[in-house]
């Protein structure tokens, strides 16, 4: 049985597999990478590094949507 960890995704607590990457979570929860910036523990993540970031218990992930205006 895989060990589980808890993360907070856009303000909601989620239980995920311990060895999950940020990329896995983006795919599982269908976050549109083309339209958002990803923040991990209050820091913007370089999209080139998303596949190599392993998540830890209590990590906080936010998808920040771009809004046009003028």
What are these regions (language model features)?
Residues 1-69:
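Ubiquitin-like/PB1-type beta-grasp interaction modules and other compact soluble beta-rich domains
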């Amino acid at each position: 049985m895989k060990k589980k960890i808890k993360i907070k995704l856009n303000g909601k607590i989620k239980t995920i597999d311990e060895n999950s990457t940020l990329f896995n979570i983006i795919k599982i929860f269908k976050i549109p990478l083309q339209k958002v910036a990803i923040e991990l523990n209050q820091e913007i993540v370089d999209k080139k590094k998303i596949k190599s970031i392993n998540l830890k218990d209590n990590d906080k992930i936010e998808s920040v949507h771009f809004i046009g205006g003028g």
